[in-house]
């Protein structure tokens, strides 16, 4: 048991060192996936032998570790193949070789240089979707070789050009237009160039408009991101951001009781707000205050002393390794730390975006000390906040 725990600790230390190093070599990305493979194989072995937790790491189910190990092995094979291609000396980041990006449409392709394409429906900028255009694709062809192609956008959708010169669309704007546009009209905006729904011609390469101008009339058709290159056919539709929902109506004013301004001011005059240095010093949940005038105001002022937190956003495995290092080396600089978690879709349990992890502190001074002393990977985003009820 101790030997297994030490082995897992060693793997996770190597992983976190890679995250902090932020190497852009393809060899480092191969090492990253090999370490993930070893980690999942070790956890799978532990689960088979009835071990539920190894050090600070809970052991996942057999199916979970098996699937993660298979994905890691697949990525190792693809990256080893890419190392034998002319593109092995290019800069490659963890994001460029991530499983999520590799599997995003078009699938089984390496992608770089993301850019946002916005689509507005019915001329309403509040009713819009955003799509990702990948500036560079590296795609495996029928001969088992990797070839580079680039992407472009026109009124129909986002495409790349295959080896025969065909436009292969991996985003079709009309699919969502049928759902979100009442009259079927939509406008495509990319790099400050606008394509109107009146455009029906075939895609043609055009030069982007200056960044400070948006043409009132649409160009002949396309706003390309690059010249023609080779690549196989793949046609899929990217995930998208849903249009904004209608605003929530407020209750009628007659249903809300309001005290007269002079009455409220006089009643609140004896309530002392916390000093700036006291904000964030509270470590327990605020109880219910006695009933009476301005009870909610008194609660809010008391809640201003709730304990501070930070929310870290990044890859799930990256956050897990970071949590291990924080607990083993910097435990005196925070109060407690959560497991990694994700937002889920409103209609299913599918994870959305990157992982998150919360760290709670006794006070703002401890949080400031943590942020100044603990090195965090630059690929990890940090958000500050306070929670009522922690």
Curated annotation (Swiss-Prot):
Q: Repressor as a keyword?
A: yes
List every stretch annotated Transactivation domain: 1-202
Q: Where is this region: Disordered?
A: 199-296
Compartmental location: Host nucleus
GO CC annotations, alphabetized = host cell nucleus
* One record GO biological process: viral DNA genome replication
Q: Mention any Pfam family matching this sequence.
A: PPV_E2_N
Biased composition regions of type Low complexity, renumbered to the chain: 282-292
Superkingdom of this protein's organism: Viruses
Q: Specify the cross-link site (Glycyl lysine isopeptide (Lys-Gly) (interchain with G-Cter in SUMO)).
A: 313
Q: Which UniProt keywords apply?
A: Activator, DNA replication, DNA-binding, Early protein, Host nucleus, Isopeptide bond, Phosphoprotein, Repressor, Transcription, Transcription regulation, Ubl conjugation
PTM remark:
Phosphorylated.
Gene Ontology molecular function: DNA binding; DNA-binding transcription factor activity; nucleotide binding
Chain intervals for the UniProt region annotation (DNA-binding domain)? 306-390
Q: Which family does it belong to?
A: Belongs to the papillomaviridae E2 protein family.
Question: What does the UniProt function comment say about this protein?
Answer: Plays a role in the initiation of viral DNA replication. A dimer of E2 interacts with a dimer of E1 in order to improve specificity of E1 DNA binding activity. Once the complex recognizes and binds DNA at specific sites, the E2 dimer is removed from DNA. E2 also regulates viral transcription through binding to the E2RE response element (5'-ACCNNNNNNGGT-3') present in multiple copies in the regulatory regions of the viral genome. Activates or represses transcription depending on E2RE's position with regards to proximal promoter elements including the TATA-box.
Q: Share what the entry says about its subunit structure, partners included.
A: Binds DNA as homodimer. Interacts with protein E1; this interaction greatly increases E1 DNA-binding activity. Interacts with protein L1; this interaction enhances E2-dependent replication and transcription activation. Interacts with protein L2; this interaction inhibits E2 transcriptional activity but not DNA replication function E2. Interacts with protein E7; this interaction inhibits E7 oncogenic activity. Interacts with host TAF1; this interaction modulates E2-dependent transcriptional regulation. Interacts with host BRD4; this interaction mediates E2 transcriptional activation function.
Looking up HAMAP family in the UniProt record yields:
PPV_E2 (MF_04001)
Protein's UniProt name: Regulatory protein E2
Species:
Cottontail rabbit papillomavirus (strain Kansas)
